[in-house]
UniProtKB/Swiss-Prot annotation:
Domain of life the protein comes from: Eukaryota
KW Nucleus (keyword) present: yes
Residues bearing the modification Phosphoserine: 199
Record's subcellular location: Nucleus; Cytoplasm
UniProt effect for mutating residue 144 to G: Does not affect interaction with TBP. Knockin mice are fertile
Gene source species: Mus musculus (Mouse)
Coiled coil: 358-433
GO biological process terms, semicolon-separated: flagellated sperm motility; spermatid development; transcription initiation at RNA polymerase II promoter
Protein's name in the database: Transcription initiation factor TFIID subunit 7-like
Length: 471
């Protein structure tokens, strides 16, 4: 033990060392420290006690264990009984534990905002860790608790304690891996430069009417110390941008008269109806739906969900027609037809496959026709250019053959457009949804324009062919 080892080094007899080993913690009681120290100072003045008072104020939890371990003090404590020593030991242990618990409580912190010069000086003081520099930073609060005077290196700055828009968590770490929360920071001490008047952070607008003064004084006092910005530049004016109160628009008198309060009282029945419709949708074998436009909602009757059975042929045909409509609109080639094929007969499956094959063949034929038409137009244009340069030596037979081929291809393309337009007309008859009708009407209008253009091109080529045949 420490006290047992210190006694021989100071030249004390072995008897004093044994006495200290029996009751090493007796000097920890604060009451006995004062009395024994005085006795030791009066009886044995030769023991040096200069550095001891300096170390007694270092920490808060070792206050009662810093008595000078002198032999005279140990001899003067031979008289107390063993039970009294144990009681004093328990009391001192409890006191030291309470002091340690108080030291680990949550701290009270605030942010100190200083001008650049003073901030640099405070940062230098903190990093130096010199105890002699601790007097260069002082903060004196006024009795109201919201105003203060901050003194940094003999420079006094007026300061105001303001409330931040939100709470900031303060953390500390020792190894830069594990963080411990120390406080919740919600206030900031803002220091203004020396000689500059400190403006309030948020000046409320207070009405001067006699009836409003009493109500607005409390709000004005609260808003007086509210800081409307955050601590970083992106949070400028964040109290109004992010944390402002939502304004409620008051309806006009005419709107209040038009409000039907029965709609609000019937909300439970509406919820029951919605649940019933959802249950019916879940139990249905197949469901029909349509996209309803808000403008035409009054003209269209909502069809809702209709549960059907495989025995009803009309609904089966209707579902197939809907499938054909969506396939035509999205350009699908029959890859998503598994659900429809399971509910149709074998004959319907064969018909669908034949239709898909025809659609695929028509699309392929259209692509080939377009490519050949473009090539023939380029070839004919080149021949026209050669004919204009060498009119006498040019043979008309090659030009007439090219014109005839181009007329044939354009007539074939015209037939395809005509068939497509007829199919769009059939789809328009089957579809009941106005949105789909509008889509197919637009497609049909484009096909009619293409049909007119092809007819004009064919007529122009026929006139050119007549001219070359006459020559």
């Amino acid at each position: 033990m420490e006290r047992g080892e210190e006694a021989p080094t100071e030249g004390a007899p072995p008897e004093g060392a044994l006495v200290e080993a029996k009751a090493p913690v007796i000097p920890e009681a604060p009451a006995t420290d004062v009395s024994t120290t005085e006795e030791a100072g009066s009886k044995e003045p030769q023991v040096p006690s200069g550095p001891r008072p300096e170390g007694a104020g270092d920490t808060c939890d070792t206050r009662g264990a810093r008595g000078p371990p002198t032999p005279g003090r140990a001899k003067s404590q031979k008289t107390p009984r063993q039970g009294t020593a144990r009681c004093q030991t328990l009391e001192s242990a409890m006191r030291s534990m309470s002091v340690r618990l108080e030291c680990h409580d949550v701290e009270e912190q605030f942010i100190l905002r200083l001008p650049p010069e003073q901030a640099y000086a405070v940062r230098k003081i903190i990093h130096s860790r010199n105890a002699a520099w601790k007097d260069k930073l002082k903060i004196d609060f006024s009795p109201d608790g919201h105003h203060a005077v901050v003194q940094v290196d003999n420079v006094s700055l007026p300061a105001k304690l303001v409330n931040l828009p939100c709470v900031i968590g303060s953390l500390k770490t020792i190894d830069r891996k594990t963080f411990y929360k120390t406080a919740d920071v919600s206030q900031m001490l803002v220091c203004s430069p020396e000689g500059e008047p400190h403006s309030p952070p948020e000046e409320p607008v207070v009405s001067t009417g006699p009836t409003v003064i009493g109500i607005s004084e409390g709000k004005a006092e609260r808003k007086k110390y509210n800081w409307k910005h955050g601590i970083t530049p992106p949070l400028k004016n964040v109290r109004k941008k992010r944390f402002r109160k939502t304004t409620k628009k008051l309806p006009d008198v005419k709107q209040v008269d038009e409000i039907n309060f029965s709609e609000y009282t019937q909300s439970p029945s509406v919820e029951k109806e919605v649940k019933r419709l959802l249950y019916s949708d879940a139990e249905a074998v197949s469901v029909r739906w349509e996209v309803v436009d808000d403008d035409d909602a009054k003209e269209i009757e909502s069809q809702g969900s209709m549960p059907t059975t495989p025995g009803i042929s009309q609904m089966g045909g209707a579902s197939l027609s809907d499938y054909d409509v969506f396939r035509e609109m999205m350009g699908d080639s029959g890859s998503n037809s598994n659900d429809v094929e399971e509910k149709s007969n074998e004959g319907d499956d064969d018909d669908d496959e034949d239709e898909d094959d025809e659609d695929y063949g028509n699309e392929k034929e259209e692509e080939e026709t377009d490519n050949s038409e473009e090539e023939l137009e380029k070839e004919l244009q080149a021949k026209f250019n050669e004919f204009s340069l060498h009119e006498a030596d040019q043979d008309y037979s090659s030009i007439t053959m090219a014109i005839q081929k181009l007329i044939f291809i354009k007539e074939k393309r015209l037939q395809m457009i005509y068939k497509k337009a007829q199919r769009q007309k059939e789809l328009l008859r089957k579809v009941e949804n106005l949105t789909l009708k509008r889509h197919f009407q637009n497609v049909l209008g484009k096909l009619n324009i293409m049909e007119k253009e092809k007819c004009e091109q064919i007529y122009h080529l026929q006139e050119q062919l007549k001219c070359f045949l006459k020559e």
